[in-house]
C-alpha cells in the first residue's frame, strides 16, 4: 500500500545498516575512497547524535560468489573469497570512521585476530552501548548465505529496531523505475503485499527472517546525502516494510 500521510515514523535507537559492496567501489573493482568517506561521514553524524549503529557490508566490489560459480568455480570456495572481500570493505570503513572521530570495532565471522575481533553478539552490544559503531565482516562465516541474510540475522541477535537497506534507488517500486517511468514507489507496505506483488526487498532468506520475527525493513537511497540520518530519525523516506 502507498500512503500520502506526512506523519513522521518512529525514530530508532539501534539500527542495522546494510551496505552493498558495489557502492564502495563506485561502480568499479576495488574501493573508491570518496564514496567510503562520504558514507563514513554520514554514519559518524548519526553516531554522534546518540543512535547506535551496526553495519554489514557486501563484498561485490571485489568478488561475487554466485557469479564466480557460473564460471565453473566451486561455490563454497568462491563464497569464502567474497567473505574476504567484505572484510577489506569493513577495514576501509573503520579507518574513515576514525578520521571522522568515531570509535569503531570490526567483528568477523571468520577468525582474523590480527585485524578484527571475533563475532560475539554480547560484546557487540556492549560496544554499541558505549557509542561505538560495530561493523560485521566475513558474512555468516559459511558459504551459501548472502550478506543480506547476515544483516538480518545480526540485527535480530543484537536487538536492532530496524534493518536499513541502503540502495541506489529511492525505495521499493512496483516495477523497475529505470525502465518503466510509470513505476510506483511504495512508502509503506506489508510483508504479505511484498510476496503477493513479487517485489524485491532483500534475498528470500533475509526477508523471511525479518518477516517471521517482525523486524521492520526500511529501503532507502544511500546516494542522497543525509539519508542515513533521515532514516534513523524517522523521516518519511524510502519504503518501510512492516506488518
Curated annotation (Swiss-Prot):
HAMAP family listed in its UniProt record: PyrH_B (MF_01220_B)
BP GO annotations: 'de novo' CTP biosynthetic process; UDP biosynthetic process
Reaction(s) catalysed by this chain's protein: UMP + ATP = UDP + ADP
Subunit annotation: Homohexamer.
Localization: Cytoplasm
Protein keywords: ATP-binding, Cytoplasm, Kinase, Nucleotide-binding, Pyrimidine biosynthesis, Transferase
Domain of life per record: Bacteria
Gene3D superfamilies recorded: Acetylglutamate kinase-like (3.40.1160.10)
Family named by the database record: Belongs to the UMP kinase family.
EC category name: transferase
Annotated Gene Ontology cellular component terms: cytoplasm
Ligand binding (ATP): 18-21, 60, 64, 173, 176
Pathway(s) it belongs to: Pyrimidine metabolism; CTP biosynthesis via de novo pathway; UDP from UMP (UMPK route): step 1/1
Main localization, broad class: cytoplasm
Organism: Corynebacterium efficiens (strain DSM 44549 / YS-314 / AJ 12310 / JCM 11189 / NBRC 100395)
Residues noted as binding UMP in the record, renumbered to the chain: 59, 79, 140-147
Protein name: Uridylate kinase
Amino acid at each position: 500500500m502507498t500512503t500520502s500521510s506526512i506523519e513522521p515514523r518512529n525514530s530508532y535507537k539501534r539500527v542495522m545498516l546494510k551496505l552493498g559492496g558495489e557502492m564502495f567501489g563506485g561502480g568499479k573493482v576495488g574501493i573508491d575512497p570518496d564514496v567510503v568517506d562520504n558514507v563514513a561521514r554520514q554514519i559518524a553524524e548519526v553516531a554522534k547524535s546518540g543512535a547506535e549503529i551496526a553495519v554489514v557490508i557486501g563484498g561485490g566490489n571485489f568478488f561475487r560468489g554466485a557469479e564466480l560459480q557460473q564460471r565453473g568455480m566451486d561455490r563454497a570456495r568462491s563464497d569464502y573469497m567474497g567473505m574476504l572481500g567484505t572484510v577489506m570493505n569493513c577495514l576501509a570503513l573503520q579507518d574513515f570512521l576514525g578520521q571522522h572521530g568515531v570509535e569503531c570495532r570490526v567483528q568477523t565471522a571468520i577468525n582474523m585476530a590480527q585485524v578484527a575481533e571475533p563475532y560475539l553478539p554480547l560484546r557487540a552490544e556492549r560496544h554499541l552501548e558505549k557509542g561505538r559503531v560495530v561493523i560485521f565482516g566475513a558474512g555468516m562465516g559459511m558459504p551459501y548465505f548472502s550478506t543480506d541474510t547476515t544483516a538480518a540475522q545480526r540485527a535480530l541477535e543484537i536487538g536492532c529496531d530496524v534493518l536499513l537497506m541502503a540502495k541506489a534507488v529511492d525505495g521499493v517500486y512496483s516495477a523497475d523505475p529505470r525502465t518503466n517511468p510509470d513505476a510506483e514507489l511504495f512508502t509503506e507496505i506489508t510483508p504479505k503485499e511484498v510476496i503477493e506483488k513479487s517485489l524485491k526487498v532483500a534475498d528470500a532468506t533475509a526477508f523471511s527472517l525479518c518477516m517471521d520475527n517482525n523486524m521492520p525493513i526500511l529501503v532507502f537511497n544511500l546516494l542522497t546525502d543525509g539519508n542515513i540520518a533521515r532514516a534513523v530519525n524517522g523521516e518519511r523516506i524510502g519504503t518501510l516494510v512492516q506488518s
